[in-house]
Regions:
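M16 family metallopeptidases and their MPP-like homologs
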Residues: 1, 8-15, 67-83, 104-196
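An aromatic/glycine/proline-enriched structural segment found at the starts
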Residues: 6, 11-68, 74-77
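Extracellular/periplasmic bilobed ligand-binding domains
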Residues: 25-29, 88, 103
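Active/ligand-binding-proximal structured segments within catalytic/core domains
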Residues: 72, 82-96
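Hydrophobic (often cysteine-bearing) scaffold residues that line and stabilize catalytic clefts
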Residues: 23, 87, 143
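A generic secondary-structure signal for well-formed alpha-helical elements
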Residues: 22, 30-38, 98, 107, ...
Length: 196
């Protein structure tokens, strides 16, 4: 009762090999017994938004194996649509491909550059993209310049055809492999219906 005082506005999603005749009485017993009112469920916007503008923070700590960890995070408002989520995926994949060549293979400055993005629709429709890597104290400035230069280049010139094709092939293969995975369907349904 403390955790679920009111189930109004809840959406329950089931995926997988489920016999509806077996599921129905379980839903009626366990979910149907949760009280619900006519009052719509709302959330509290605590206004904890990312800081606007550029922020540089440097932290130092003693370590047995000295290293420098670099983390860039870009945020902003963006309509929460499947098309925008897909565009962000293409961008992160294209940057990952470029950094693999320019930062890891050509400079040998890190084991890898992680690039990942996400979108949100509550409390506002936003995106976030993070670029993160570890390196040594001698190479951090040089690698940071390369990372930002590649980002500017893709913003001004767009992605390379080969980056688009590689990403398309990866996404198609990932989708085909995921068709038999419950998690794929759950993520799709949550993305499609989660934002209303």
């Amino acid at each position: 009762k403390k955790l679920f005082p009111d189930a109004n506005s809840f959406r329950f999603t089931f995926v997988g090999n489920i016999d509806p005749e077996v599921l129905k009485p379980l839903v009626e017993k366990y979910i149907g017994s949760i009280p619900a009112s006519k009052k719509p469920m709302t959330f509290v916007d605590d206004k904890a938004y990312p800081v606007k503008g550029e922020v540089n923070d440097t932290f130092t700590a003693k370590m047995q194996q000295p290293k420098v960890s670099i983390n860039y995070t870009f945020t902003g408002e963006m309509d929460y649509t499947i098309e925008n989520k897909l565009a962000l995926t293409y961008l992160t994949q294209a940057l990952s491909s470029r950094y693999l060549v320019s930062v890891r293979e050509e400079k040998g400055g890190t084991y890898g550059v992680q690039v990942y993005g996400s979108t949100e629709y509550i409390p506002r429709e936003t995106y976030s993209m993070t670029i993160a890597f570890d390196t040594n104290d001698e190479m951090d400035d040089e690698l940071c310049e390369i990372v930002i230069a590649e980002l500017k280049k893709i913003a001004e010139e767009g992605p390379l055809t080969e980056d688009i094709e590689k990403t398309r092939e990866f996404l198609l293969k990932d989708w085909q492999n995921g068709l038999e995975q419950n998690g794929t369907w759950m993520r799709y349904l949550q993305m499609k219906y989660g934002s209303g």
